[in-house]
Amino acid sequence: MEEGDGGLRSLVPGGPLLLVLYGLLEASGGGRALPQLSDDIPFRVNWPGTEFSLPTTGVLYKEDNYIIMTTAHKEKYKCILPLVTSGDEEEEKDYKGPNPRELLEPLFKQSSCSYRIESYWTYEVCHGKHIRQYHEEKETGQKVNIHEYYLGNMLAKNLLYEKEREAKENEKSNEIPTKNIEGQMTPYYPVGMGNGTPCSLKQNRPRSSTVMYICHPESKHEILSVAEVTTCEYEVVILTPLLCSHPKYKFRASPVNDIFCQSLPGSPFKPLTLRQLEQQEEILRVPFRRNKEEDLPSAKEERFPAIHKPIAVGSQPVLTVGTTHISKLTDDQLIKEFLSGSYCFHGGVGWWKYEFCYGKHVHQYHEDKDNGKTSVVVGTWNQEEHVEWAKKNTARAYHLQDDGTQTVRMVSHFYGNGDICDITDKPRQVTVKLKCKESDSPHAVTVYMLEPHSCQYILGVESPVICKILDTADENGLLSLPN
């Protein structure tokens, strides 16, 4: 909600300003009720004065669709409300065309597949058939090795049953499920797939997925995202133009809906209390000036908690990736704490998160309000084991500069002796790859995990902080404080 003439603003649609108005005003108007407000529909209150004409384009308005609002100071306002949903409801009511399953039928009959290529995994969605996650390893003179998981399958009889069941459900119910896509609640058509590759973390129960088809007029059935919402249960979002002819699945922008409140005779342009509130906000906007002593960072400054977020739509992230912002300690102090293992990096989105403490351990964990924290030890540090590993593997990789000099591009460390794996009956192990990350934020850290073989992991850690210590790596890739 925001005010139309540049006054009070709020980032939450339908939030503080309307709440303030509800607290200041009471409604009357011969049986009219306050509108049903939703955070999905943004509103903006305008105070246009007495000389005013309603907009003739965009959102519809009617002169008789208003509420008389009275403040605690007996100020009265006539607030004209937008007809937010009337046009859409009429279109949906008149629709007699194919149901969403029938609209998607050509996609299922074509035996077409969509792909999403990421840094390690490739995702294959063969519509109405299966979802596959795979990685190909090709070695010189040898055949291609494929590491794959099926995230869901759909047999022909299941497809027929699904078609009949969902068609009946659509006739009975008008509720369309929605998903938050880039901040907008977007309707989707779900297709369930089960019978995937057995999941060792769930007593070998099969993996399963929900494919969410959403309308996008200019798309070509692309895979927008793949997410593991719980252990071995996935959500796959597909963009398709086929649903766009159905009014309930149409892509709609969320314009700001204006509410126009005009003062009635004897009342001021705006409510007194609202004007006082605006004046208070203006005072708070005056920059707070600190003296020089306060500008200095405190030695006891607490670290900020980790903030995990998904990669923006349109990028090519790995399956599990997170970005965290670390504290504003000086770089030297931060490097010391990182190398001592007392400062740990955290990352990951979705069900599992990851903790990496240099020279100590790599943990995979999930926190739940009801069941507490579930943690899996992926690997623990043993310098002797790492040195033996480094004799057979590349622990220090170089980058050749334009002037012919070499700089360390990445170091790899081996962490073994993790928890026993149900599939292999061997301890889990992980190779940690530390890379320099160029970023505008000097304290940004990206952490991601791959599983190229069962219970054998790769943990990628990228940060500008690592840039400053890579060149200290010895022949075994071990790091130290820079001079």
UniProtKB/Swiss-Prot annotation:
Keywords: Disulfide bond, Endoplasmic reticulum, Glycoprotein, Repeat, Signal. The keyword Cell cycle does not apply. Residues 111-246, 342-469 form the MRH domain. This is Endoplasmic reticulum lectin 1. One of its GO terms (molecular function) is unfolded protein binding. It holds the Pfam family PRKCSH. It comes from Mus musculus. PROSITE patterns: MRH. One of its GO terms (biological process) is negative regulation of retrograde protein transport, ER to cytosol. Its main location: endoplasmic reticulum. May form a complex with OS9, HSPA5, SYVN1, and SEL1L with which it interacts directly. Interacts (via PRKCSH 2 domain) with KREMEN2 (when glycosylated). Interacts with HSPA5. Disulfide bonds join C113-C126, C199-C232, C215-C244, C344-C357, C421-C455, C436-C467. Glycans are attached at N195. PANTHER family: ENDOPLASMIC RETICULUM LECTIN 1, OS-9-RELATED. Probable lectin that binds selectively to improperly folded lumenal proteins. May function in endoplasmic reticulum quality control and endoplasmic reticulum-associated degradation (ERAD) of both non-glycosylated proteins and glycoproteins. The lineage of its organism: Eukaryota, Metazoa, Chordata, Craniata, Vertebrata. The gene is Erlec1. Residues 1-33 form the signal peptide. GO terms for cellular component: endoplasmic reticulum lumen. The keyword Lipid biosynthesis does not apply. N-glycosylated. It comes from the Eukaryota.
